């Protein structure tokens, strides 16, 4: 049984077929990269799966349960979380409190964060564990707004991970950061996936990152899947090379 499966998923925006009968599977424990040129349909597909868009038709099954009609919050509770291309943090709160707030929300705790943080030892302990996993333990008392861009990206992923999903979608986690920060972010995410804690689907444009970290790569083009396979097979695919890498086969 696949962890996630979509069945003939469709979404149009006027004349644009952004998701054209997509049958997509994600297997438990894999690191999957979703690639394609701008406008290929990658973010639309993830938005459909995470309930930020409604499909025109088709079904979404998670752990063999039909979740097509569930809301964003219901899908989070079911075990699906995501981070966005544009970092979504509370800059006025500390790094620690950003993660703690995600844990409070996950557990349905609604009191003021200052009260909860002062009185909930379990949440404080779990927050420290998440920060340590993401290399942010020493930054806990800083405000999120004080972090460097790469650290902000890491914190954004850590906040999504603190929801303890079974499936985590990451939308361009390495955009607008240095090469060293890219490695730090992806090494951390890869380590969490390899530990068995979560399955990850990453939208990524940096093909060096994609080939280095992925177990499987799926390429979208004009709302449909053009290629699906392990890195070596995708690297050797002439259609992929032509569209993504600008490489044409010899005449």
At which residue positions do the language-model features occur?
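Glycine-rich phosphate-binding loops of nucleotide-dependent enzymes
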Residues: 2-251
